[in-house]
Amino acid sequence: MSKPKYNRVVLKLSGEALAGEQGFGINPTVIKSVAEQVKEIAELDVEVAVVVGGGNIWRGKIGSEMGMDRAGADYMGMLATVMNSLALQDSLENIGIQTRVQTSIEMRQVAEPYIRRKAVRHLEKKRVVIFAAGTGNPYFSTDTTAALRAAEIEADVILMAKNNVDGVYNADPSIDPTATKYETLTYLDVLKEGLGVMDSTASSLCMDNDIPLIVFSVMEKGNIKRAVLGENIGTVVRGK
């Protein structure tokens, strides 16, 4: 059996990835597939933390464009991530993977509050930890949550699993057939070129803390395991 390249990872899933082709809500087939892929790497003794977006249910930015208070709209988005996290927890536990959900906003009847030392202890015990409710602050994306939590738990890498693209391109491949995929990039490249990998706050946090990022498609089964084993898939972003 191949040895994993990374021992502790943060898997970033967009909410849209959980919606699948239906585009909204949670697709049972997709979430089951994601859970099975997480199980594959957990069985390699990789310590797995997960950050899930909420865009399949609600986006704070859309709410603010409708005239809502931005902070209130963002809090709704955080609650959407909790719904996704509980659904993923259920899928993982149904296939025998011990899982804990930790939320940045306290809701003790639903999940544990986020405590860094406790999260690390869960990981050391080979439990999958799902970080929900973003950073607990409005105006911060779940990409930034992934970068922040990765820094806090000293993760080796962030695995950014996409549902509609298999890496980072110099143009939108769904519009421009000549778009070229990058194999490697630096965070400065991402910031200078305005590449839509993650928002600038998240990119800067990763760059400052020297956290590599792998962008790949989650729709191809086995890709999460391939990324953990260090196979050449997607786009790798690192350094300055």
Swiss-Prot record:
Taxonomic superkingdom: Bacteria
Gene Ontology CC terms: cytoplasm
Pfam families linked to this entry: AA_kinase
Listed pathway(s): Pyrimidine metabolism; CTP biosynthesis via de novo pathway; UDP from UMP (UMPK route): step 1/1
A GO molecular-function annotation: ATP binding
Residues that hold ATP according to the record: K12, L13, S14, G15, G55, R59, N163, Y169, D172
Keywords tagged on the record: Allosteric enzyme, ATP-binding, Cytoplasm, Kinase, Nucleotide-binding, Pyrimidine biosynthesis, Transferase
Main location class: cytoplasm
EC number: 2.7.4.22
Residues involved in UMP binding: G54, D74, T135, G136, N137, P138, Y139, F140, S141, T142
Reactions catalysed, as given in the entry: UMP + ATP = UDP + ADP
Stretch list, region Involved in allosteric activation by GTP: 20-25
GO biological process assignments: 'de novo' CTP biosynthetic process; UDP biosynthetic process
Gene3D superfamilies: Acetylglutamate kinase-like
Subcellular location: Cytoplasm
Regulation: Allosterically activated by GTP. Inhibited by UTP.
Functional description taken from the UniProt entry: Catalyzes the reversible phosphorylation of UMP to UDP.
Family membership noted in the UniProt record: Belongs to the UMP kinase family.
Protein name: Uridylate kinase
UniProt source species: Bacillus cereus (strain ATCC 14579 / DSM 31 / CCUG 7414 / JCM 2152 / NBRC 15305 / NCIMB 9373 / NCTC 2599 / NRRL B-3711)
Lineage: Bacteria, Bacillati, Bacillota, Bacilli, Bacillales
